[in-house]
Amino acid sequence: MSAPTTNAAPRAKTGYADRFKGGVIMDVVNPEQARIAEAAGAVAVMALERVPADIRAQGGVSRMSDPDMIDGILEAVDIPVMAKARIGHFVEAQVLQSLGVHFIDESEVLTPADYANHIDKFAFEVPFVCGATNLGEALRRVNEGAAMIRSKGEAGTGDVSNAVTHMRTIRAEINRLTSMAEDELYVAAKELQAPYELVVHVAREGKLPVPLLTAGGIATPADAAMMMQLGADGVFVGSGIFKSGNPEQRARAIVAATQNYNDPDTIARVSRGLGEAMVGINVDDLPVSHRLAERGW
């Protein structure tokens, strides 16, 4: 599928990101998985060489995927293909744009390349998605040009608790702004370490200026539906599908649950007979230094 023409205009990039609302974006490591994801109803796939669970288990430095691998997935499906670049690694982003990916994830799942600076996303035609654990972090990424935000969660664990915490935090901070007087927003902007203009926008609109999706630890249809009920615009699923016992059926079930997140009968029906979910890791058992969501600022 050919890449979108965005002309580096923030509004156009955000408009392109709107197409993913209400949908599921799935991590895939080869063309076969990409085709499974497309057949299951995924709105996009994330091409990477190792899913987060394997990155976590194998350790070492994790970088952008091989261009040949990304090309194979681009050729295999007709839905948009995303790919990850390291935080701050603008040359990896340049390469991904050259390859024709439709979205770049400046991702904490990969080993950060720069501990002081994120990528200047306005310098690219391709839109970016970035992770956030709170509203200030989300607005700083938007100020750098991100066209989509995802609450981080804790990737590769199968434990949805951090995804819940981050989504609730962002939503609560948004709600707090909506009740503030205009003069209080100056103080809020300082506290959030975010531009005043973006803080005012959130206060007036009651939402981010870009779509807010969720990620990290989503492993079941019920997980996906819960995150949608908590206010997510869509769902990223990483290890939860292809580290499970029946990836094809689980992928379809998570898509159905995301689309019908307020329908317990549908969620119950699609949750039957899925086989074993990924084994997972309790986030509380992870040392702070091993928590991927801590990356970024």
Swiss-Prot record:
Which pathway or pathways does this protein act in? Cofactor biosynthesis; pyridoxal 5'-phosphate biosynthesis
Q: Which NCBIfam families match?
A: PRK04180.1, pyridoxal 5'-phosphate synthase lyase subunit PdxS
Q: PROSITE patterns from the xrefs?
A: PDXS_SNZ_1 (PS01235), PDXS_SNZ_2 (PS51129)
The annotated subunit structure for this chain is: In the presence of PdxT, forms a dodecamer of heterodimers.
Role: Catalyzes the formation of pyridoxal 5'-phosphate from ribose 5-phosphate (RBP), glyceraldehyde 3-phosphate (G3P) and ammonia. The ammonia is provided by the PdxT subunit. Can also use ribulose 5-phosphate and dihydroxyacetone phosphate as substrates, resulting from enzyme-catalyzed isomerization of RBP and G3P, respectively.
Alphabetized, the UniProt keywords read:
Lyase, Pyridoxal phosphate, Schiff base
Q: What is this protein called?
A: Pyridoxal 5'-phosphate synthase subunit PdxS
Q: Which reaction does it catalyse?
A: aldehydo-D-ribose 5-phosphate + D-glyceraldehyde 3-phosphate + L-glutamine = pyridoxal 5'-phosphate + L-glutamate + phosphate + 3 H2O + H(+)
User: Encoded by which gene?
Assistant: pdxS
Q: Which residues bind D-ribose 5-phosphate?
A: D27, G156, G217, G238, S239
Q: Which GO molecular function, any one, fits this protein according to its record? A: pyridoxal 5'-phosphate synthase (glutamine hydrolysing) activity
- Tell me what organism the protein belongs to: Corynebacterium efficiens (strain DSM 44549 / YS-314 / AJ 12310 / JCM 11189 / NBRC 100395)
